[in-house]
A protein has these predicted regions:
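Acidic, contiguous N-terminal accessory segments
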Residues: 23, 194-305, 313, 317-331
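Substrate-binding groove of N-acetylhexosamine-processing glycoside hydrolases
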Residues: 57-60, 197-200, 211-225, 425, ...
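Glycan-recognition and processing domains
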Residues: 204-213, 723-783, 853, 857-875
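Aromatic-lined carbohydrate-binding surfaces of glycoside hydrolases
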Residues: 342-516
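Beta-strand-rich ligand-recognition modules
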Residues: 751-759, 769-773, 784, 795-869
Length: 878
């Protein structure tokens, strides 16, 4: 029996059972039977709906329209697609009749109707869900926002633009927080859609909140005075700049927002001249000269981008309190050609923020319609953003991860290429570009490819090249950045079933203008050396585009006022000469402060000052006083980093709870003041979450778990290894320390990709982290000791070239500093001698990693499996 026939038979049986239940009296037993029959019917219908959705609507893996016929490059016909969509809608309607309160089914049904072009019916379904949001006392903010945004989508699709705008305004005014990892931020999408419909973008925000009347990023050459020129009315004069240039409108609207009347041409007390001049003083691309005098200001540049950055600097030099501008002069240009970030979603201030940070390259990984949900409103929003980015001369890329990562299609199928071409053309016709990730979800390679003896290193590059050429043929200005699956190198492991160097060499067939991301362990690990960059460049024939990951100092989170040592992580010349572009992977707008500091560094590498930069970034987004409000609580809040996201570990047994409580109270008070000063602080950074983590730690510390019991199975194996490798003998007074006995939170039952054995270890990270040392306490008995102690340490070094040095001390007295003796990818045991005169009755042994690094989640590190102390009876000082 074929699958459709089986499904139909199951449906008939379930329907019969359900009808029988409904015909009888509602006794408890029969009510239960009816409920079970209803669940069974829903289960069968769910299977049928899933069958339909793989070929229609917005399914998770985007098989929309495309058959899985390996020999076909054609999609389903409109007639076939319509038939499947009609069946899908019918099944979902039946499901909703059975479960009328299931919002998930209702949203899916409404989406299916939207996909089928039945917009009015979809609106009715969405409104039905919306009504249930207000039934009872509990309000589900996420469901309210989701239903109201979808209602606006349906209205817009029917041509009711004004009605859609009003619906979006209603949602915006609710100020609901719907930012969640991995799901749509409906409130952010609503605000962006409303602002685009209102024509507010690119002036939808109040940025900059405070500049101190100085340019940002730090100019290359600048002469500031303490004098200001009054501005009441301004005439804008244009030389080589068109009247309808968006840079001109941007300046006029920004002046108007400060209460300064501005007009193009005419005679006013003050004039601003914007000039594209082949003989402008700064010869560099995007460079400009800005001169601000008592009666006039002039921006001179050799290209439109230079004019834009000169306009931005003029706006930043406006007084924060008066209608005036600082008198100054600057010659300025960027050190790094392409500067930007990977954002997590569209938000209303995306374009403005990018402009004020003088960045020019942005990738949006999540956006309305990123799963193929191309409703007219979502397409409008993406198209409008792409249009405005293009008008300002900035690069905008949309990610297509739902079409590439974990797709499950063979690259040798003709339909795979056709589907990718269609999706890329969808964005290219907007004037946007595409980010194509294979990243860490490329494997396993499809069986139809491996059956032909093909691996990813054989098929990926030709596929990407064919895709790129097909789109460029239609849209010659189209750009692409491709993220291959092989992480970093040459130091980190090649963890995928392919030859890493063969794969990277295969990318040489891609043209130089098709960019390649370079990501993985060591990019997340911050520090990069020239040898590594040359390795990638030589293999691929491309300078890398950096996909900078994991920059948050607090278990990957940013607490807003942290300093970021961008220059410390990179060698001289890296930003200026050796890369094609630098993008920071970010949760936006949450991480905008740190992104602003990156923009500062990429613009003026040598002039970057990490303290000044974060102060100005915070002020730019949140106001002059916000940094000083939050900063006093940062140090104490950092103490809680050892308890990742508020989960306690064995370190709580070593910690001072009174000090932790004081640190929490200080940070909590700072946060309360910050929210009162500017509630928008809740949008940026994770300071508030950090306060919440601290509260969880203190609550859990009142009744900590039995850590020995929690890790019992790991500890038994670790203890056996220590006994075997050191001849440990408790009867002789030997002392053993396993990861639970060592301070520091980072322990794991760990297997390095290139090491065949698992071990329970404590990680000691780089010297610039809060996890750079681990302590153990021991009693010297008898005291004074008869002689020295021997220290046995089993550990492994990280995979990065060059071994970590360590420092060993007892009670603050250093008795060893130098190479650890540990090696990469193999556990070894090393012996050290502790001089007897270092010891007291009660002692504190500390192992510190001296390896330079600030990454709390990657290299440099040493992994410690155990520590054993033995009495020697020998006195080394004699």
């Amino acid at each position: 029996m074929k699958r459709p026939a089986i499904v139909m038979a199951c449906l008939l049986l379930c329907a019969a059972a359900l009808d029988a239940c409904l015909a009888d009296s509602p006794e408890p037993a029969k009510q239960a039977a009816c409920a079970e029959a209803r669940r069974e019917k829903l289960k069968v219908l769910r299977g049928k709906a899933d069958q339909c959705s793989t070929l229609s609507c917005w399914s998770p893996w985007l098989r929309r329209k495309w058959t899985t016929d390996k020999n076909s490059a054609k999609p389903l016909s409109e007639e076939e697609l319509a038939a499947i969509s009609d069946e899908y809608c019918a099944v979902l309607k039946e499901m909703l009749d059975l479960a009328p309160d299931e919002a998930k089914i209702a949203f899916e049904y409404g989406d299916a109707l939207m996909f089928s072009g039945k917009y009015a019916e979809a609106e009715r379904v969405y409104r039905r869900v919306h009504e249930t949001c207000f039934a009872g006392s509990r309000r589900d903010a996420f469901k309210i926002a989701q239903s109201e945004y979808r209602i606006a989508e349906a209205l817009f699709a029917q041509g009711f633009r004004s009605g859609a705008k009003d619906q979006l305004k209603t949602l915006v005014d609710r100020k609901l927080v719907t930012s969640r990892r991995g799901v749509e931020d409906w409130s952010a999408y609503a605000k962006a859609s409303y602002d685009f419909l209102s024509g507010a973008v690119p002036c939808a925000t109040e940025l900059p909140r405070w500049t101190g009347a100085k340019a940002f990023p730090e100019p290359q050459r600048v002469e500031y005075t303490d004098d200001f020129a009054p501005l009441s009315e301004v005439s804008v004069r244009l030389v080589g700049v068109k009247r309808d240039d968006p840079r001109v409108d941007f300046l006029v609207r920004r002046l108007a927002a400060r209460g300064i009347k501005a007009a193009i041409g005419g005679r006013c007390p003050y004039s601003v001249t914007l000039s594209i001049d082949a003989k402008a003083p700064v010869e560099r691309s995007e460079g400009y000269t800005l001169e601000i005098g008592e009666k006039e200001a002039t921006v001179r540049a050799r290209d439109g981008q230079g004019v834009l950055w000169g306009v931005v600097s003029f706006i930043q030099c406006l007084s924060d309190t008066e209608r005036a501008v600082r008198i100054c002069r600057m010659d300025d240009w960027p050190d790094t050609a392409r500067r930007g970030y990977l954002g997590s979603c569209i938000w209303s201030g995306c374009l403005e923020f990018t402009i004020f940070c003088k960045m020019n390259s942005v990738v949006l990984q999540d956006y309305p319609g990123d799963s193929g949900r191309d409703t007219p409103l979502n397409v409008f929003q993406c198209t409008e953003l792409a249009r405005q980015f293009g008008a300002f001369g900035l690069e905008l890329y949309f990610g297509i991860s739902n079409y590439t990562m974990g797709l499950g299609w063979a690259y040798s199928w003709a339909g795979t290429l056709s589907m990718h071409v269609e999706r890329c053309c969808h964005f290219a016709q907007m004037g946007a570009n595409v980010y194509y990730p294979n990243d860490d979800m490329r494997y396993p390679v499809h069986a139809d490819d491996t059956a032909k003896g093909l691996n990813a290193s054989d098929v990926d590059a030709p596929h990407v090249l064919a895709l790129y050429n097909a789109v460029r043929e239609k849209y010659p200005k189209f750009k692409m950045v491709y993220c291959p699956p092989f992480y970093w190198g040459p130091d980190s492991s090649a963890a995928y079933p392919d030859d890493r160097e063969k794969y990277l060499k295969s990318l040489r067939i891609l043209p130089p203008e098709l960019d390649l991301y370079w990501t993985g362990g060591q990019v997340k690990g911050y520090n990069k050396c020239k040898r590594q960059v040359e390795w990638f460049t030589n293999l691929t024939g491309h300078r890398p585009v950096i996909f900078q990951n994991g920059t948050g100092a607090h278990n990957l989170l940013s607490y807003l006022v942290d300093e970021t040592d961008w220059n410390g992580w990179h060698y001289p010349g890296f930003f200026e000469n050796d890369i094609a572009a630098f993008h920071k992977n970010s949760h936006t707008p949450n991480e905008c402060v740190q992104i602003s500091t990156l923009g500062d560094c990429l613009w003026n590498v040598k002039g970057y000052d990490k303290r000044r930069s974060v102060e100005r970034g915070v002020a730019f987004l949140l106001g002059e006083d916000m940094f000083s409000i939050l900063k006093p609580g940062l140090e104490g809040l950092t103490r809680f980093d050892r308890y990742k996201y508020g989960d306690i570990n064995a370190d709580i047994l070593y910690d001072d709870l009174d000090e932790l409580r004081k640190a929490y109270e200080t940070a909590s008070n700072c946060w309360a003041k910050a929210v009162a000063y500017n509630p928008e602080v809740q949008v940026y950074g994770a300071y508030g979450r950090g306060v919440g983590f601290a509260a969880r730690v203190l609550a859990a510390a009142k009744n900590p778990p039995d850590f020995l019991a929690k890790y019992a199975q790991y500890l038994a194996a670790a203890r056996a290894e220590a006994v075997k490798e050191t001849a440990f003998d408790k009867e002789k007074g030997d002392l053993m320390y396993l990861p639970t006995d060592m301070s520091g939170p980072q322990m794991d039952f760990y297997k390095h990709p290139n090491v065949d054995e698992y071990r329970f270890v404590k990680f000691i990270r780089g010297a610039q982290t809060v996890f750079s040392a681990s302590e153990m306490k021991f009693e010297c008995d008898p005291f004074p000791p008869a002689g020295d102690y021997e220290l046995y340490v089993a550990g492994m070094d990280d995979e990065v070239e060059g071994l970590n040095d360590i420092e060993l001390s007892v009670n603050g007295k250093v008795f060893y500093s130098g190479p650890s003796g540990f090696v990469p990818r193999k556990y070894t045991m090393k012996k050290f001698r502790i001089p007897f005169d270092c010891m007291e009755r009660h002692n504190k042994l500390k192992i510190r990693n001296l390896g330079v690094g600030a990454n709390a989640n990657g290299p440099p590190y040493i992994a410690i499996a155990y520590v054993v102390l033995k009495k020697t009876g020998e006195n080394s000082s004699r």
